[in-house]
């Protein structure tokens, strides 16, 4: 940086761009020994600096900077550059060029965040991962128009060089910003575009014209605002980059011939369409989706029908939803603002949003497969309706187009059914196509806006930003194309830097040895794009029938594996890597590619039927525009029928335009464009993978430097000649360096002469330049040296020219004064003579006669002069006309010359190309001639063979013709066979499907037939057996009559119980489902938790046994806190005494100040002072000096007191640290005890292994829960990251509370670990319960209870997690407040010299905070103790559950014993955590109180700052006054001049005051958002302004009235004032240092205030979230109410059913009276049936047999028997259903509904059959009654089970009600918090209004004072004018006196004969006449 301007070093961005002079000097002074200092390899840092100690052979012993002594080989050591090259700005200047030096230089610069470094001809930039102040407008102005060597490395320097090259060379430029993904390409692109926009606008402004954009803003604003639009729709989050450009863009900024901005355009490449529908883990979809959902526009989501949360929409919620550090709401606002500036219409913007929302709705469209059909159908139409509404099409037609698209079969169009997979692909493909075409439309729309047609476009500068090289765990089709494009760009760089450069040297005839840098990438490029390459084979596979991704991968392996060095077989995946099918060796590394979906992505098929709908969209014009150029197959067919030439093209050939073809064409166009421009390269580097600022991963950076060719670029830049100029250009620019040599007309000879002259002068050497055929070549930096020489000569010439002009002007002024002097002397002499002769009579006569003698002559002379003037004017006009004609001719000739020059240059370039081609042709000719000789010899041999072959040919030709015919026939046959094969395959598939369906039908029929045959056989056997039992039926009837009454009662009870059960089952179903899911999840987690248990169980036991010790320790800490509070009280008293002393000193100072002002007034009022008065003044000044010394001593004492306070505080912190160590020891003891518990758990684990094996089949169904578990795991990871953030924030707590907070955090971590342990243990117990559910109904009921408890625990755990998060937020806020307290304490310490009364208030506020934090800690520990009570309650509940389990089985009791031990501890900690959650509310209230106190402390410190500022201004004013008075005394008696100086001084002071007022007003406007301290600033500024203006007004009056007397009196006190001046200067310096400290503290306060504002915003977000939760709870309550109403309806239905059953009972009663005779026998039969009830299945079979026998014997009672059989079957089904409900609770409600319907049908049938039975035999009725009685007994058993379950359901309901009440209580508390925040906001707004009024009052006061001052200033100006008039009069009077004394009156007639005297005489004569 040879010419860095001094002004730039003061810019805030300079430290991040270059080194200061002092830093360079310090670096250069570092000791260095070139023979000893070196670099050696290091595994961590790449290379490390070392010093050679000794050398032995080829071994070198070195000592590294780390202090390690290492022996390495000599060839491993690399040279180190001298210290003067430290942090060098251009690595091409390094003395030793090696990897170690380059890496070391980049690391040193990056450590200071100097991210830009030149590397020869290009610039290297390292991503800083933070915002730097190096892109501001001030930095742009510094770089604008500067040469590269004048400024430090910067992107702007390269941009300005490109701009100057474009303007000077009239050549298009390009800037290639390349690098890997995440290296910062997009950000640098935005900065480059902004720079060109500003430069172009500045050029336009310099030309007097500013180009306005078409609609929304200026053209430069529109160019800049394209970035937000493109980023919103084209950027997304990837694993390596939060704002990765997922498309490439080439932005061309056009300029006019004069460099004015003339518009721009954009071309895009490789948009990643697949991201719209799929995102990998850790990534996100395009930003626009999340911006729309951010809620920036409250009404927008409603218009777009996006009423659900973002997680509902599958297309954009597959991975990440937010980005750290990015506010989607703010980004949405910027995007909308960019749309407005770009001139987008509102309808256009809304269509974009609607289309985007339509894609989101398309992702939620559900389809399902029809049973036994290859046809998909819609599964719900809500999302389809929304999508169609957004796209402007009909929903029904849209769904039909997706499920049954129209296809062409022969010559007809039919609807083809699609299966589920095909429909899903069609939806995804259509969504991708819509988004891609929409993005293309946005590009075209931006180009339309940027097209400034009124300005002619001459040249452009293009900026290329394309996706960087990507190597992911899973690389697909998109990564292949991105990496291929980067491969082409790297090849372009290598070709431009290394090949073209050296070829041009050879063309120009320069002696040069070709260097092969080994960077040719052509092999990899040909592997991908050449015929039979990867892309070619892919396109071929896309048109091959039945081709798949696997066949494509296999073809690649067969074609290239082992045959091409860049193609490899992929290695097995490691870690998270996905499967791969092939690998390619790129320049940046080997990439493994997965070939899945390659063919589908390359073909990118679309559903033509759906596209046809979109082409006719109704109310979305965007759809019409983007699909306008798309031609469907139907449209192509119609066009072909109509005879249009392009009709069939779309349907056939264009369908094979694959994505690869389109990409390849656009890439070739891009490369052609780049080859036609002059490129500038920006290489972006990723410093590390962790996105950490200031950290360099040496291996990663070295790999990128090697791949990018950085070292090779530096080498060729140093060895070669990177700069060159044509001979005419060189002569034109540098002729001034050798004017004589440049006179030659031949540009080449003139240029050589100029260079010889420069070389002879010693400014250049022959090695620094070379003479070519058409150009001169220079080494790097030579042109800069020539520019410096040129500037130096121009400076000398301009200086000499200026001196000549000044000399001429001075001489002309001397001549003018000499002539003036001569004329004045003559006039004076004539006047004196006239005064003497005016009374002489002859002179009077002469005066009368003289005019008459010369009047005629004068008239003639005047006439001649008029004629001459007229002739001269005509001649002048003719000359002007001729000159204008000549100027026109000259301009035409200049234009012709320029045109000829350009054509000459073009011809020269063409000539050079022709010569190059000629040379290549000559070489080719020589090669061909050598080949020709070889071929001639071969030809002779071949002729001989030809004769032999000719004979054979004739014989073979006949055979060949026959074979050809045969082959043609075979081909024709083969084609026909192929067509028939395809049609038959289709028919076979359809027939196979039909056969499969028919086979299924046949199988079913056979099965039914067998079943019927078996039933018939059984019926025949049962009929025979039942004939013997008919006699016994009458006996059973009598027994049934007695049981009929019981039946009626049982039915009533059953109906009531069923209604209750139906009501409760809906409620229980949700809990059961959640419990089942939790059980499944816990089972899946079991294996993972087993290892965790081994580490965590010791903590559990330790926590239970050591809780009492921790509570005792907490009490001890509380006592110590109280002791610290007592110490603080003592310190408070000491501060009070210090404050009193400070107040006393201030009062003394104020009194002395007033005395000093009174003395000054007396001095000005009195004319002089006596010696006694002067002596008194000296004494007073001595007293003032003494008081100042005392004041300084007081300040020192105060600092001593503050230091003692700090020391005491440090001691207290040390004690707390010791206590923390004690806690850690206790924790270690607990770890030992936990090991014992682990052994017990292992024994229990062995017992459960057998049960685990039995549940393996059940675990298969748990696979569906894995996704949920992964989500929970993700949440756990997020919580872990939150804990890490919490730990990082906790480290910033002050020393007073840090240890206590860490203790609380450890306890929280233990609580969390115990909860996780509890959940694990609970899962084991639940698994044990589920194993015994099948053994006993009681155990099943108990398991259901346990599931409910587990559900409750899960809800409580979620509540605990939410409260833990809120607690973490609160803790972070407390840490921020504590950090702010520390800052204010620091300011308190540094501002001890000012206002101790405000410090007193700040100290009290700090003490209050400490007291409140102590109380908070006491509350925490007290609430921990209170958790014990809740623990006992839960233990009792668990004991009850345990007793139930013990009744079930002894084995269950064994497991329950261990469970109780674990659950006691877990539930204890759970309740403790719940209390901690409630405690958070109190902590939040404490936090608000702390915030209030902090604001008070800020106010006090702001007052201190204002007071210091006023003191500084007073001291500055006094010092200036002393200086002015001293200067006045030194100048003596020049009183008037002194008055003027005083006036000017007062004006300066007035300007300072005005400036201070303006600054205060600006500060008030800027700090309106910081309302908490604005009031103090405004009031202080207003009082200071009034005070200062009043003082100055008094000073003005006193000064104007008494300035003469003050000057005389101050002469005697000059020595005393001199001493006072020195003292004032010393105080001034001290105050200035204090002011700097206060300004730093003020910046801290501003940042703290901004953090507080962020906290307020966060609270507002919390309030909104709570409102959402309230709405969700209300919705749940409504659902419960609806369920209750539904249960009541079911109860009514069952009541009606009961009435029907009562009627049935009456009918049965009538049958009972008819069968009374056989009652005894029926009773016996009933006893037998009762014994059979124990086995439900056997009882059911027997009952069926009896019913069938009765049916065969008594045809009249068939109906009643069938009815009884159905009732028996129903009873069995009911029993089976109840058992099934215990295993599968989610199907329970469906069973109830089916049972209800079945009962209704059965009751109707039974009523009919009972009526028939009255007319039948009596024996049949007895049988029916017996069956009913059996069914009653079964129902009674079922009823008992249902009653037990009903009781459990009621318990769960009561628990749910308790949870609802808890939630309602939380909602009330959150509402209270919201009301408090609202009140706070209202107060802040009121204060803001007050502040604004105060500002307006201050402005009015300032304006009135300013008017007063202007009046005084006018009076002073009048006095100055009067003084000047008096001085002029006095000087004239003195001159008259001197003139009258020196002139002697003449005695005669001494008139001088001169023109002047003649003129005087003529005037005299005229007067005489």
Swiss-Prot record:
Ranges for domain Myosin N-terminal SH3-like: 33-82
Stretches for region Actin-binding: 667-689, 770-784
Disordered: region residues: 943-967, 993-1029, 1134-1153
Subcellular location: Cytoplasm, Myofibril; Cytoplasm, Myofibril, Sarcomere, A band
GO biological process assignments: locomotory behavior; muscle contraction; sarcomere organization
Cited SUPFAM superfamilies: Myosin rod fragments, P-loop containing nucleoside triphosphate hydrolases, Tropomyosin
Modified residues (N6,N6,N6-trimethyllysine): 130
Keyword set includes Nucleotide-binding: yes
Residues annotated as domain IQ: 794-823
Family: Belongs to the TRAFAC class myosin-kinesin ATPase superfamily. Myosin family.
More details: MHC A and MHC B are found exclusively in the body wall muscle. They co-assemble into body wall thick filament.
Subunit structure: Muscle myosin is a hexameric protein that consists of 2 heavy chain subunits (MHC), 2 alkali light chain subunits (MLC) and 2 regulatory light chain subunits (MLC-2).
Function field: Essential for muscle contraction. Involved in ovulation likely by regulating the contraction of gonadal myoepithelial sheath cells.
Protein name as it appears in the record: Myosin-3
Organism: Caenorhabditis briggsae
